């Protein structure tokens, strides 16, 4: 089992933290937001107050490692299709979104399964502010 640590990038620290917290403020159906570094570290994690995680830390870590591999695969198609904006998987209990922030960072967001598409639009708006 790999050790899960949290680090902070000094120049982006408050910006990334604010991004996660602002995503949780979008709607009560947003359960979780995290920024995960491609080298394997959780930089920030925010979970809605009163909720318990559905995955333990190791399962969450492995899930994001797999997401990084999938984003690498998507980049191979970028020339033909253009850059991917996000990826989404709908499970019985939640929807899980991943967003490519830059070459080093992935944003993960989990919502309740009945969350509507307006939440996604608002997340994309918040990301566009971060990536400017």
Give the predicted meaning of each segment.
Residues 1-132:
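Non-catalytic interaction/Regulatory regions outside core domains
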């Amino acid at each position: 089992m790999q050790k899960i640590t949290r680090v902070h990038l000094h120049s982006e620290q408050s910006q990334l933290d604010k991004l996660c917290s602002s995503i949780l403020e979008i709607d009560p159906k947003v359960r979780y937001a995290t920024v995960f570094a491609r080298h394997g570290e959780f930089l920030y994690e925010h979970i809605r107050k009163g909720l318990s995680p559905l995955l333990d830390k190791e399962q969450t870590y492995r899930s994001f490692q797999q997401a990084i591999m999938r984003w690498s695969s998507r980049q191979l198609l970028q020339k033909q299709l253009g850059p991917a904006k996000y990826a989404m998987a709908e499970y019985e209990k939640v929807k899980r979104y991943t967003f490519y922030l830059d070459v080093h960072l992935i944003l993960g967001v989990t919502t309740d399964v009945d969350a509507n598409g307006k939440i996604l639009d608002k997340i994309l708006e918040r990301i566009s502010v971060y990536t400017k």
